[in-house]
Amino acid sequence: MTLSPEKEHVRPRDAADNDPVAVARGLAEKWRATAVERDRAGGSATAEREDLRASALLSLLVPREYGGWGADWPTAIEVVREIAAADGSLGHLFGYHLTNAPMIELIGSQEQEEHLYTQIAQNNWWTGNASSENNSHELDVKVSATPTEDGGYVLNGTKHFCSGAKGSDLLFVFGVVQDDSPQQGAIIAAAIPTSRAGVTPNDDWAAIGMRQTDSGSTDFHNVKVEPDEVLGAPNAFVLAFIQSERGSLFRPIAQLIFANVYLGIAHGALDAAREYTRTQARPWTPAGIQQATEDPYTIRSYGEFTIALQGADAAAREAAHLVQTVWDKGDALTPEDRGELMAKVSGVKSLATNAALNISSGVFEVIGARGTHPRYGFDRFWRNVRTHSLHDPVSYKIADVGKHTLNGQYPIPGFTS
């Protein structure tokens, strides 16, 4: 195949010999020490992304026959949560990487699956996302894909919110055919080298949270897409959603990963607050106690935080097992399978969003005024959750659950459901 990014990376270990959750936990411990400083600085988490590359976790979902870990979805979800607990931006980046790679299997050919999975595993490739545009609505795709005589395309335009594009090796991109050919108006998906001439990831990401996700824009100027880099036929990705085919599993999987990024951040906030309350918080004098850990209202708050997380964690793990069950059905997937999964994931997304927002803001009540000093960085937890939880309105996820419960309706397959 023609798809072969110029840079290669030596795979440092046999992934099958390690516990991926333990590997992630070890990395998280290292990153936790610099998380506040890096959040304040923004920019790119270059060193930390190289840590992930060296760990071989980038091939977590790559089947073992292609050299990867061959991990199941419940394990992958746990890894995302461990990483996000230490650093929301890194959890975000790794989560997007995990949503990108299965696109190969969901809509690509067997040859593409074998080639790309093998390359990801052997060279520890990062995958980047270039699907969204800053237009009137999510289906208003304007990056043009002009067909070429050899069956490929030429891309022109700008994508936005390209999480992980900068520093990636493989870029997943969508374009719309805008010529007078029979393909006019069709959306094509492709996996191309990020280093391809004409691809420019820009340093223009600016938000209150997720500051090290490189989620800025990416320009495409006369970018050649080779025929064997095109994933599926024109409109294959769109039709998969309309017909509830296996390719439409991309969305419930992505939504579940997002939910677990939030839960990881909530765990990180709770852990950091607990340590502060135990070691630095002062008791409230009128309470007549000797230590802040004896305050009945503080104790109640920690109880409420923990209970909220227990419920959301349990729901998330149950949904991860359902993802695996549905994934294993392959082409035998039914619209009912897909609908039940999306309804379940919608509930998890709501639980995780609310729990993470409440905990990341509520911890300030148990650490006290001194804990608001920037050196502690407690605000980063809320900023990270608040920023990404606006990806798609959680109110619509709640409505999806309500429609399913009351009227037996499944969420309508789409790019956010």
Swiss-Prot record:
Pfam families assigned to the protein according to its UniProt record, in alphabetical order: Acyl-CoA_dh_2, Acyl-CoA_dh_M, Acyl-CoA_dh_N
Gene3D superfamilies associated with the record: Acyl-CoA dehydrogenase/oxidase, N-terminal domain, Butyryl-CoA Dehydrogenase, subunit A, domain 2, Butyryl-CoA Dehydrogenase, subunit A, domain 3
EC number of the protein: 1.14.14.21
Keyword Flavoprotein: yes
One GO cellular component, as annotated: cytoplasm
Signal peptide: none
Induction: Repressed by HBP or sulfate. Part of the dszA-dszB-dszC operon. This protein is expressed at high levels (at protein level).
Biotechnology: Expression in B.subtilis confers the ability to remove sulfur from polycyclic aromatic sulfur compounds found in gasoline and diesel (biodesulfurization), which are a considerable source of pollution. Modification of the operon so the start codon of dszB no longer overlaps with the stop codon of dszA leads to increased expression of DszB (in R.erythropolis) and about 5-fold higher levels of desulfurization of DBT. Rearrangement of the operon into the order dszB-dszC-dszA leads to 12-fold higher levels of DBT desulfurization.
Catalytic reaction equation(s): dibenzothiophene + 2 FMNH2 + 2 O2 = dibenzothiophene 5,5-dioxide + 2 FMN + 2 H2O + 2 H(+); dibenzothiophene + FMNH2 + O2 = dibenzothiophene 5-oxide + FMN + H2O + H(+); dibenzothiophene 5-oxide + FMNH2 + O2 = dibenzothiophene 5,5-dioxide + FMN + H2O + H(+)
Effect of Y96A: Nearly wild-type catalytic activity
GO terms of molecular function: 3-methylbutanoyl-CoA dehydrogenase activity; flavin adenine dinucleotide binding; monooxygenase activity
Pathway stated in the Swiss-Prot or TrEMBL entry: Sulfur metabolism; dibenzothiophene degradation
SUPFAM superfamilies: Acyl-CoA dehydrogenase C-terminal domain-like (SSF47203), Acyl-CoA dehydrogenase NM domain-like (SSF56645)
Subcellular location: Cytoplasm
Region annotated Central beta-barrel N-terminus, chain positions: 126-234
Binding residues annotated for FMN, in chain numbering: 96, 129-134, 159-163, 282, 369-370, 391
Region (Helical C-terminus), start-end ranges: 235-409
Enzyme kind, highest EC tier: oxidoreductase
Chain segments carrying region Helical N-terminus: 19-125
Alphabetical UniProt keywords: Cytoplasm, Flavoprotein, FMN, Monooxygenase, Nucleotide-binding, Oxidoreductase
Domain remarks: Has 3 domains, the helical N-terminus (residues 19-125), a beta-barrel central domain (126-234) and a helical C-terminus (235-409). The C-terminus (410-417) forms part of the substrate-binding pocket with the C-terminal helical domain. The lid loop assumes one of 2 conformations allowing opening and closing of the active site.
Family affiliation: Belongs to the DszC flavin monooxygenase family.
Subunit: Homotetramer.
Additional information: Reduced flavin is provided by flavin reductase DszD.
Annotated function: Catalyzes the first step of the '4S' desulfurization pathway that removes covalently bound sulfur from dibenzothiophene (DBT) without breaking carbon-carbon bonds. Sulfur dioxygenase which converts DBT to DBT-sulfone (DBTO2 or DBT 5,5-dioxide) in a stepwise manner.
Name of the protein this chain belongs to: Dibenzothiophene monooxygenase
Origin species: Rhodococcus erythropolis
Taxonomic lineage of the native organism: Bacteria, Bacillati, Actinomycetota, Actinomycetes, Mycobacteriales
